[in-house]
Amino acid sequence: MKKNNSFLDRLFMALVFVFLYAPIVLLIVFSFNSGNSNMVWKGFSLHWYTKLFRNRIIMQSVYTTLLVSLLATIIATVAGTFAAIGFYAMRRRVRNPLMTVNNIPMMNADVVTGVSMCLLFVAFFSGWGSFASWFNTLGLFRLPTHLTMGFGTLLIAHITFNIPYVILSVGPKLRQMDRNLVDAAMDLGCTWMQAFWKVIIPEIKPGIVSGALTAFTMSIDDFVISYFTAGSSSSTLAMTIYGMTKKKVTPEINAISTLLFVTVLVLLAVINVREARQERKLAAEQRR
């Protein structure tokens, strides 16, 4: 009876994985198809990848995606690390409610976050013209009187939804750190800044790296929030793919999606490997 149950469990899991990953496998396979069809295999070819890298619109969206992701990751990692340290220094009754607020953007629906940020930018830009006109009358220097959504709003949106992930990654490393290390460093003559760079940063470095990789992955993979905050002058890779699918799903789209999938998969694998090594290292230290 137990063997039958075990077989059924494995069969069920296999069917679940087939259901989840069969479309992705087909997408990857037909990205190498020499023909235009997504149903009939004509032979192996790199034609669609070659065509992909010659497409100016796609390359521009790749450049925008990478630039936004890198800048958002750097800024969110710095801001999130300092925020996590600030939370760590607070009393528990103050820290716990703030951590709950920090977790809301991660649990909130992306469409709600995207629409709310879009409305925020629209409200800000509507009042900016009057302020800029008044400021320009002072004669100090001139401010632009007309602002629109574009690369700047897209970057701000990505920074905003990435910071909570960094805080969530750095926080546990701070709780594992011995508070006495900082006091000991300062007793030995270190300033607070020296203790920060020589004691705190090395202790929480794994959390910072994991948070940065997670933020970069989330930025590359984001579509909904970017769609509502990019305006008409900027387009990420996910937005470009969405626009292309409205016309026709070609092997060129398969090639883009394959590259995006592989990129995210590699980043997630790096994150998981790092976390597994950290857990083994921590377990080894506890056994000593």
Task: Identify the residue ranges that each predicted region occupies.
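Short membrane-interfacial helix/loop motifs at transmembrane-helix boundaries
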Residues: 22-56, 227-232, 288
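Interhelical loop and adjacent transmembrane-helix boundary motif
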Residues: 2-6, 49-57, 219-276
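Hydrophobic alpha-helical transmembrane segments of multipass integral membrane proteins
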Residues: 59, 63, 67-79, 83, ...
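C-terminal transmembrane helix and the adjacent membrane-cytosol boundary/short C-terminal tail
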Residues: 2-12, 171-186, 196-198, 254-288
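Membrane-interfacial helix termini and adjacent extracytoplasmic/periplasmic loops
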Residues: 37-38, 46, 111-159, 193, ...
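Transmembrane alpha-helices
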Residues: 12, 17-24, 108, 160-173, ...
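Transmembrane-helix boundary motif in ABC transporter permease subunits
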Residues: 1-6, 71-102, 115, 119-123, ...
